[in-house]
């Protein structure tokens, strides 16, 4: 459910920009309204195809389900990649008492999913609401409530249906393997903060749509051939293993920037990643991004991410001979209820714009 969608706060958007921050935020909210946990992304890619076709482009969906769209330009092909698959859950077992055991899709924090509203989607498209709860979750009954470990053996989904047995649940059409979607609770505050699950990475997807719009309306002039790529299995480690154009020379992954202890970046900045769990990013390409940020007075930070992987590593492991770099708006509380800011979007768009037009 999208709780609130408001305009970017006045005075916080750079009016000299060619790319539209408000449009990027609007498209982010649009994408957040569509459930798309890993393995259940058809609806969100249908939306991407529709948006891009309305702009006059000819996007394609790969067999694996990703969306690729060439925006124009000539020579030295550059791909910009974001992912539209999100974290989620899947029915692992229907318990004898009518509650659901689950397995995680990707790596949502167990602590962060407790008490979250969910929607269970059956194979035939029925939707049932529910909530993630700890077994024996009443504090007036369970004296060990605060100390009990949260994991997939102690957390369960309670359906908003009158059920008390496995048979009751099966009569609803719910089966093992059904998708369980977490409520994103997306909103933009009057002070410019963007709060939602799955800003990783629908915030970046919104920014790539803003780039496409900038090219479509002629405000951005690509200095080279540019393709935008939306992967759908990033959260489980094989998003960009296929589907990137064969002629790609450089890959700029646009994914969430880390915010936290021992990290320089804030939610208002664009983060440039020097190294993550898989090793350093391409030195020359990363240096180009840093130089552009300085040249254009973009508010940026360079950081090392201690527990992070991206579609760049996936593409490299598939054997691609490419340069690769990673940028993104600063996002706090990753894989939980995340927070960023419109200034982080703005600074990211300014860097994307500068790199797209770089000779």
What role is predicted for each listed range?
Residues 1-359:
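N-terminal hydrophobic/helix-forming segments and targeting peptides
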């Amino acid at each position: 459910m999208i709780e609130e969608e408001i305009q970017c706060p006045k005075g916080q958007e750079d009016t000299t920009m060619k790319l539209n921050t408000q449009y990027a935020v609007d498209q982010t909210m649009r994408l957040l309204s569509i459930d798309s946990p890993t393995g259940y992304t058809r609806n969100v890619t249908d939306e991407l195809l529709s948006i891009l076709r309305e702009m006059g482009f000819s996007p394609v969906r790969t067999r694996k389900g990703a969306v690729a769209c060439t925006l124009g330009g000539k020579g030295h092909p550059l791909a910009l990649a974001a992912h539209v698959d999100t974290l989620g859950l899947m029915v692992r077992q229907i318990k004898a008492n009518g509650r659901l055991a689950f397995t995680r899709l990707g790596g949502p924090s167990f602590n962060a999913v407790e008490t979250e509203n969910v929607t269970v989607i059956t194979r035939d498209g029925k939707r049932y609401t529910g909530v993630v709860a700890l077994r024996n979750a009443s504090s007036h009954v369970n004296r060990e409530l605060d100390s009990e470990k949260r994991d997939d053996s102690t957390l369960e989904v309670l359906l908003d249906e009158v059920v008390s047995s496995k048979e009751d649940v099966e009569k609803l059409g719910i089966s093992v393997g059904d998708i369980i979607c977490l409520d994103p609770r997306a909103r933009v505050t009057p002070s410019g903060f963007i709060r939602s699950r799955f800003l990783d990475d629908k915030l970046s997807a919104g920014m790539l749509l803003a780039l496409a719009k900038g090219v479509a309306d002629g405000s951005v002039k690509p200095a080279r051939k540019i393709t935008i790529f939306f992967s759908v299995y990033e959260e489980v480690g094989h998003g960009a293993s296929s589907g990137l154009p064969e002629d790609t020379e450089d890959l700029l992954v646009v994914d969430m920037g880390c915010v936290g202890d021992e990290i320089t970046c804030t939610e208002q900045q664009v983060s440039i990643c020097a190294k993550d769990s898989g090793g350093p990013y391409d030195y020359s390409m990363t240096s180009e991004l840093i130089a552009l940020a300085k040249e254009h007075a973009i508010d940026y930070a360079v950081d090392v991410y201690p527990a992070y992987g991206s579609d760049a590593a996936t593409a490299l492991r598939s054997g691609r001979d490419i340069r690769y770099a990673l940028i993104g708006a600063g996002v706090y509380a990753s894989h939980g209820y995340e927070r960023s800011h419109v200034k982080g979007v703005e600074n990211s768009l300014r860097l994307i714009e500068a790199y797209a037009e770089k000779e």
